[in-house]
């Protein structure tokens, strides 16, 4: 990644050191399609620092998934948005933790340029990911809702994941009270299948709450992750049960493992 945000969970990888080959990506994608996986999300790290990212998307596109999305910090999105759309990318999530200059390594200008490019390229609906941090950006939630409204974007308010005990203790912000306020204001509350997440439709903007350390999150998790070296990761929070990819049976094993993980956690 071209940033080093102190709260980043790195998709659960402690020491990512490799970059998966295009050949391995296609092998995994082909087998994922064969067992009924419908959606692919590309994340990182920062996917756009990979020089062949458009080739990665082009490979995925060949297999006709319902949705191909990408999570980015937005720094390079202005440069690559149209190329990514041409390769087959449907939409993007942009990290947008603050609109204050340099509060979290990014400037408002970086975010706005990436957002503008994504809109012009048709990478929509755009989601803005805001990790809410006590004492850093928790006073900006209303401002961010307005920003999402102005830009026809969905705002995801995300609770901090504990990757550093000291940082977590100082900056964890519980979103329960915010969620109560949204429930009062919402025209419609939508419950999504994935993670049992709730979306609050305020009429002219949609707000989604993401709370990673909850029973609902684990019980309704429908994701498998692929690590940077091509192994299958059934759970974001664990690294002791990675599965080496060999064929579609590896993916099926990982899916079965998710059920075991949930029982153990509860």
Per-region residue spans from a language model:
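Canonical Radical SAM [4Fe-4S] cluster-binding loop centered on the CxxxCxxC motif
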Residues: 1-22, 234-237
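Auxiliary Fe-S-binding modules of radical SAM enzymes
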Residues: 143, 149-150, 157-266
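Short intrinsically disordered, low-complexity coil segments enriched in acidic
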Residues: 1-8, 105-116, 251
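Glycine-rich phosphate-binding "P-loop"
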Residues: 14, 41, 242
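N-terminal pre-triad scaffold of radical SAM enzymes
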Residues: 1-7, 26, 30-43, 217, ...
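A short acidic, helix-capping loop that chelates divalent metal ions and anchors anionic groups
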Residues: 13-16, 100-105, 164-168
């Amino acid at each position: 990644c071209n940033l080093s945000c102190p709260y980043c969970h790195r998709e659960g990888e402690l020491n990512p050191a490799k970059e998966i080959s295009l050949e391995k990506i296609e092998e995994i994608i082909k087998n994922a399609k064969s067992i009924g996986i419908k959606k692919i999300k590309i994340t990182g790290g920062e996917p756009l620092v990979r020089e062949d990212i458009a080739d990665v998307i082009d490979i995925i596109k060949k297999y006709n998934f319902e949705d191909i999305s990408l999570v980015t910090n937005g720094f390079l999105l202005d440069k690559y948005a149209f190329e990514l759309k041409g390769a087959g990318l449907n939409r993007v999530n942009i990290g947008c933790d603050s609109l204050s200059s340099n509060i979290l390594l990014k400037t408002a200008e970086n975010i706005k340029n990436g957002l503008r490019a994504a809109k012009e390229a048709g990478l929509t609906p755009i989601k803005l990911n805001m990790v809410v941090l006590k004492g850093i950006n928790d006073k900006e939630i209303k401002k961010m809702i307005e920003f999402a409204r102005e830009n026809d974007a969905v705002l995801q308010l995300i609770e901090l994941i504990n990757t550093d005990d000291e940082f977590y203790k100082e900056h964890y912000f519980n979103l329960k009270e915010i969620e109560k306020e949204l429930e009062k204001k919402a025209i419609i509350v939508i419950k999504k299948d994935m993670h049992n997440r709730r979306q609050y439709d305020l009429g002219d903007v949609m707000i989604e709450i993401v709370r990673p350390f909850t029973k609902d999150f684990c019980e309704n998790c429908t994701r498998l992750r692929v690590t940077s070296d091509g192994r299958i990761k059934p759970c974001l929070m664990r690294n002791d049960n990675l599965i080496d990819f060999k064929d579609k049976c590896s993916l099926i094993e990982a899916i079965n493992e998710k059920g075991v993980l949930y029982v153990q956690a509860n």
